[in-house]
Amino acid sequence: MNAKTKTNYMLKEPGVRTKLFIADETIGLGKVNLLELLSEVGSISAAARQMGMSYRRARFLLDSMQSGFCEPLFVTKRGGSNRGGAKLTPLGKDLIRRYRSHVNLVDKQSTEILAWMRSVQIK
């Protein structure tokens, strides 16, 4: 592929994406953001709405992520007159904290290579 062909692609800023793997599951920024939002709003459906996804999709992502852990990341309470909801367990909170800490370390360690990549990236 020559340089002319490459200019047809959307050029993005060089970066690093962090994905963690546990059992058969992948955990990345989107799932961690969903967990964090769930903690803030206390509802899977409200978190899903704020992220622009269906309740079903959000529930699938949360359940698939949770399936890799020996303990729950969140617990739910059925709705109705007492108003249901969801909240993170200590493990869910710990996952968010550890993921964010890991990402910060990776970002700090990546500044030199990302600067180099920006300098050699096709313009």
Feature roles, as predicted:
Residues Y9-A23:
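Short, Lys/Arg-enriched N-terminal segment that forms or immediately precedes the first helix
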